[in-house]
Amino acid sequence: PGEPGRQGMKGDAGEPGLPGRTGTPGLPGPPGPMGPPGDRGFTGKDGAMGPRGPPGPPGTPGSPGVAGPSGKPGKPGDHGRPGQSGLKGEKGDRGDIASQNMMRAVARQVCEQLISGQMSRFNQMLNQIPNDYHSNRNQPGPPGPPGPPGAAGARGEPGPGGAPGFPGRPGVQGPPGERGLPGEKGERGIGSQGPRGPPGPPGPQGESRTGPPGSTGSRGPPGPPGRPGNSGIRGPPGPPGYCDSSQCASIPYNGQGYPEPYVPEGGAYLPDREPFIVPVEPERTAEYEDDYGADEPEQQHPDHRRWRRALRPGPGQ
């Protein structure tokens, strides 16, 4: 047989076939995760005042107040009625003149002492009398003797209410009350559309998930055959090779080998025909790699899938 011809030039790409039918849409994906809570809304208007609750329990009595200042001393009592005159004594014997003068001096001294004692007591009582018009003393005088208990006075008028006491301690929380009867269903209210709220914050970035592949579309009509390529560069002839089974008999198999070469009964095996020379594809040059894929439409397949597409078996292979 003659030498294999040169590899022809790559033919022009055929026209693209008609697009297949659109596959059925895939099943809807699962619902996405729940978004973050929105901002807090505006505070609503205050409701109507509720009914007045029952009065609470009375608070603990307040602490006793501070003792007030001591009052002014009372006015002196009225002078008592003069007592009855005593009985007249018997007339004594007439004494000597010297003794009479001595008795007079003693009597005068006793009278002066009595009068001075009464005057000092009277002055002391006068000093205790308050005098709002001519009193210049800032310090109260000494307390006077206790007067006789007076008669019970009339019942006084009720005094003004005292100042409010300090707030008592909060009471212990009572047990929860029984559940009330269900109220009647109110009439249906007529609501009006409120103002539009501010836009919420942007949600988290969604995850792109590949859906299930759609059904395969119908096969388009085959394109016109490409033009025949030019003959390629002639490759170097390969060495003729064949396998002699007698040379493989001495190779150990599972740890065991033949002690001497194996010779079949019919003699050594020789091939009936000449060895078939397998053509070897020459290495691609830089110009061939630059021109590869130039005649194909752009963006038909991603760059990382171009060689994968070339490795797929074509129709009829």
Swiss-Prot record:
A motif (Cell attachment site) lies at residues 94-96. Belongs to the fibril-associated collagens with interrupted helices (FACIT) family. The keyword Protease does not apply. Residues 288-297 have a biased composition (Acidic residues). Residues 16-25, 63-73, 205-219 have a biased composition (Low complexity). One of its GO terms (biological process) is angiogenesis. It comes from Rattus norvegicus. It comes from the Eukaryota. Residues 1-99, 130-317 are annotated as: Disordered. Its main location: secreted. Residues 141-243 are annotated as: Triple-helical region (COL1) with 2 imperfections. The gene is Col12a1. It is found in: Secreted, Extracellular space, Extracellular matrix. Keywords: Cell adhesion, Collagen, Disulfide bond, Extracellular matrix, Glycoprotein, Hydroxylation, Repeat, Secreted. The triple-helical tail is stabilized by disulfide bonds at each end. Hydroxylation on proline residues within the sequence motif, GXPG, is most likely to be 4-hydroxy as this fits the requirement for 4-hydroxylation in vertebrates. Type XII collagen interacts with type I collagen-containing fibrils, the COL1 domain could be associated with the surface of the fibrils, and the COL2 and NC3 domains may be localized in the perifibrillar matrix. Residues 98-140 are annotated as: Nonhelical region (NC2). One of its GO terms (molecular function) is extracellular matrix structural constituent conferring tensile strength. Residues 271-287 have a biased composition (Basic and acidic residues). This is Collagen alpha-1(XII) chain. InterPro entries: Collagen (IPR008160), Collagen_superfamily (IPR050149).
